[in-house]
Amino acid sequence: MKRTYQPSVTRRKRTHGFRVRMKTRAGRAILNARRAKGRKRLAV
């Protein structure tokens, strides 16, 4: 059986990228929470 994590930069960016987060209200909430926490990287 193959492993479940088969890395792909494209898929990573499309599902967890900054622009995707900015699209929805919930995504923007995630970014704001990470800003408030002081995360160095907000999104992938």
Swiss-Prot record:
Matches recorded under InterPro entries: Ribosomal_bL34 (IPR000271), Ribosomal_bL34_CS (IPR020939)
An example Gene Ontology CC term for this record: ribosome
MF term (GO), any: structural constituent of ribosome
Biological process per Gene Ontology, one example term: translation
Superkingdom of source: Bacteria
UniProt KW keywords: Ribonucleoprotein, Ribosomal protein
This protein's name: Large ribosomal subunit protein bL34
Organism field: Bordetella pertussis (strain Tohama I / ATCC BAA-589 / NCTC 13251)
Source taxonomy: Bacteria, Pseudomonadati, Pseudomonadota, Betaproteobacteria, Burkholderiales
